[in-house]
Amino acid sequence: MSDIAERVKKIVIDHLGVDADKVVEGASFIDDLGADSLDTVELVMAFEEEFGVEIPDDAADSILTVGDAVKFIEKAQA
């Protein structure tokens, strides 16, 4: 797992209070990890702060899984 993926995983665990073994690449924030719409907004804000990237609203709407977040951040930092 990349450094970015590890950091994303830690943010998700801290914000949603879920078990680490549930935070896998294909895990949906809402369907698998129990997030609501406010949680997803807070996660996006936490990703922006942690990684120093801006995630526009249209991009944020397409970040539905842990893997989506990692891919977006990797691309934004490239």
From Swiss-Prot:
Coiled coil: none
Domain Carrier intervals: 2-77
Entry's Gene Ontology cellular component terms: cytosol; membrane
Keywords: Cytoplasm, Fatty acid biosynthesis, Fatty acid metabolism, Lipid biosynthesis, Lipid metabolism, Phosphopantetheine, Phosphoprotein
GO molecular function, a single term: phosphopantetheine binding
Origin superkingdom: Bacteria
Main location: cytoplasm
Pfam families: PP-binding
Disulfide bonds: none
GO terms classed as biological process: lipid A biosynthetic process
The keyword Phosphoprotein belongs to this UniProt entry's keyword annotation: yes
The UniProt record lists the keyword ATP-binding: no
Pathway: Lipid metabolism; fatty acid biosynthesis
InterPro entries documented for this protein: ACP, ACP-like_sf, PKS_PP-bd, PP-bd_ACP, Ppantetheine_attach_site
Alphabetized NCBIfam families for the sequence: acyl_carrier (TIGR00517), PRK00982.1-2 (NF002148), PRK00982.1-3 (NF002149), PRK00982.1-4 (NF002150), PRK00982.1-5 (NF002151)
Family: Belongs to the acyl carrier protein (ACP) family.
Function summary: Carrier of the growing fatty acid chain in fatty acid biosynthesis.
Protein name: Acyl carrier protein AcpP
Organism: Agrobacterium fabrum (strain C58 / ATCC 33970)
